[in-house]
């Protein structure tokens, strides 16, 4: 593994975690939005398997465009819909009520997404730390090469 591939792997991780954070932030922002369905980011190791192969092993969900990255490392392969149904409440005067007077609430659990966002943030920080270490290693190698 070269130093440049270490940078590429960490950059792929930064990109994947950034995209994950956007999904979690969107979920949290829509916690109170009726009919909103929680999105689940799918982050995979960068392999030769297609997203379709990976998702076939998981729950059926909504496939959206995702992030790809040429280096080894993590890739956000896509986003799938959480199949958990939202709670229905009877509110016939609500403008979004169905013909029977029910409104389906969002299926987002804000605590779950906050915990996932914190985990994502820590993974992002870890990738930044790796970049810092690799940068220091490269600088030390240059110093050794200069004879000092």
Predicted features and spans:
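Amphipathic alpha-helical polymerization modules
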Residues: 1-148
């Amino acid at each position: 593994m070269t130093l440049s591939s270490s940078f590429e792997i960490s950059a792929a991780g930064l990109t994947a975690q950034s995209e994950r954070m956007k999904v979690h932030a969107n979920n949290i922002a829509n916690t109170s939005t009726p009919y909103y369905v929680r999105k689940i980011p799918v982050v995979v190791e960068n392999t030769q398997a297609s997203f379709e192969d990976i998702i076939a092993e998981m729950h059926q969900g909504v496939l959206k465009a995702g992030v790809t990255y040429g280096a080894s490392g993590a890739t956000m392969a896509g986003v799938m819909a959480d199949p958990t149904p939202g709670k229905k409440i009877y509110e016939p005067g609500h403008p979004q009520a169905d013909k029977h007077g029910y409104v389906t609430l969002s299926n987002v659990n804000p605590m779950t997404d906050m915990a996932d966002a914190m985990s994502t943030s820590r993974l992002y920080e870890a990738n930044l730390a790796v970049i810092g270490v690799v940068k220091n290693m490269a600088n030390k190698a240059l110093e050794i090469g200069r004879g000092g």
